[in-house]
Design a protein with these regions (language model features):
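Nucleotide 5′-phosphate-binding alpha/beta core
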Residues: 1-80, 86-119, 127, 163, ...
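Residue-level signal for inorganic ion chemistry
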Residues: 50, 81, 121, 169, ...
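Conserved beta-strand elements of the Class I
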Residues: 120-122, 264
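Conserved adenylate-forming
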Residues: 126-244
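Conserved AMP-binding/adenylate-forming
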Residues: 203-290, 306-307
Length: 426
């Protein structure tokens, strides 16, 4: 019966899903020259239409109409997001084909951990309605709200987890060990976790391999953007990142950081906003050697997308990105915010610095974030601008805690100035 239900679900994935699934399969056998030919045709079409200048977040804020095609009611919709770097923005996306395309690529990545379409997932990231746990029947996913995992709810969470059949755990890299800490390592080892699906923050060097060896659980991991311009999977063979050539076009340009290149992306979507030579503000480590998996464009690592965690009022480390942004991109909330930054200088306390847009409802902003951070005292400060780091990159999190601020965290965490956004709300 389960197989029948899965077959029905896969049957409604849509024509774009099956088109891209076939394209992905074929592209893995392409030579480097075949990949260049496929990409150059589409990339040059964008250059002829929009020019060859490097674009920034602000270009799409100020001139969205210029970069948007076929903005037809019902066929397209407005996407509001915290943005790849935490700077809120909005753009237009295809209402149907985009989501089908996303599923094709993400399901391909998730298959590295053994996932098949509509296998059971437990998703520990983002905001959810209705308290601690919510089931999405269409996606076959149990969603656990990070904001509801306060100390008094942990007993219920642990009891519920013991009742589950085998499942895939869907997390941010920074929330994986938080989840283990919340449920307890002994219980986690007994849970029927088939694999881990880790969204597009970066694991600190060696962490992914260490987890897989320690727990005997495979991780599917990727690098992507909420702007849907480029997408790369983490290769289990070389541990680098391979960019899907049929998803979008990636350029690696020189930077001021030795051994690193700027990541520039261009999207291949036909409807909605087209991102052209878009500066992701991420850096990539130059590839070394070769990988026999495929001839996709490849980098050794992504720089500037490391985990960021805050310490709550119980001394636990939690993923800041999952709590701060999560699924807030589903409505007009981000239209009120131009920029924001979190600062922590003592456990259990967060300062939120907000650059509001004209007409912003400040009380709504404060209440929205207070609801997401019940395990910390939140102070909101409205400012005219967020300063950048000496290197010129904006920082959405400033961690001023001493390294020994918490004893309950049994896994080392890094504090870096940048974070990633997961591709889509699947």
């Amino acid at each position: 019966m389960t197989g029948v239900r899965a077959g029905v679900r896969e049957g409604v994935l849509g024509p774009s899903y099956f088109y891209h699934r076939g394209l992905i399969k074929r592209s893995k056998g392409w030579s480097a020259s075949e990949i260049r030919e496929y990409q150059d045709t589409r990339f040059q079409r964008l250059i002829r239409r929009y020019g060859d200048q490097i674009t920034q977040n602000e270009d799409y804020r100020q001139h969205l109409d210029r970069y948007t095609r076929w903005d037809v009611p019902l066929l397209t919709r407005t996407v509001r997001t915290g943005g790849t770097s935490g700077q809120p923005m909005r753009f237009t996306a295809d209402s149907f084909a985009r989501r089908q395309k996303e599923r094709a690529y993400l399901f391909d990545i998730w298959s590295q951990a053994g996932y098949a379409p509509y296998d059971l997932r437990v998703r520990y990231c983002g905001d959810i309605p209705g308290g601690l746990i919510h089931y999405n029947r269409l996606e076959n996913v149990w969603m656990v709200s990070p904001g509801a995992t306060v100390e008094r709810e942990l007993g219920e969470l642990r009891r519920w987890l013991r009742t589950l059949p085998p499942f895939f755990l869907h997390v941010y890299p920074s929330s994986l060990y938080t989840f283990i800490d919340l449920v307890g390592e002994d219980l986690f080892r007994r849970l029927p976790v088939r694999g881990v699906i880790a969204a597009s923050e970066m694991f600190p060097a060696g962490d992914q391999v260490q987890f897989e060896q320690e727990f005997g659980i495979k991780i599917a991991h990727w690098y992507g953007h909420s702007e849907y311009a480029i997408l790369a999977y983490c290769c289990r063979q070389c541990r680098g990142f391979h960019f899907y050539p049929t998803y979008g076009h990636v350029e690696l340009l020189s930077s001021e950081v030795e051994g690193c290149q700027r990541v520039i992306g261009s999207s291949f979507n036909r409807m909605g906003t087209q991102f052209v030579r878009y500066d992701t503000e991420d850096l990539a480590v130059d590839p070394t050697g070769s990988c026999a998996n495929d001839h996709f464009p490849r980098v050794n690592a992504i720089v500037g997308r490391s985990q960021e965690t805050f310490v709550d009022n119980a001394g636990r480390r939690r993923s800041l990105f999952g709590y701060a942004f999560g699924d807030l991109d589903v409505d007009a909330f981000w239209d009120q915010i131009r920029d924001l930054q979190f600062v922590q200088d003592k456990p259990g306390f967060l300062l939120l610095r907000v650059v509001p847009n004209p007409g912003a409802e400040k009380d709504q902003i404060r209440k929205a974030f207070e609801r997401r951070f019940p395990m910390a005292k939140l102070e909101v400060e409205y400012v005219s601008a967020i300063e950048r780091s000496p290197s010129g990159k904006r920082r959405y999190f400033v961690d001023r805690l001493p390294t020994d601020a918490t004893e309950s965290n049994n896994h080392p965490q890094d504090s870096h100035p940048d974070a990633a956004h997961e591709n889509g709300p699947l």
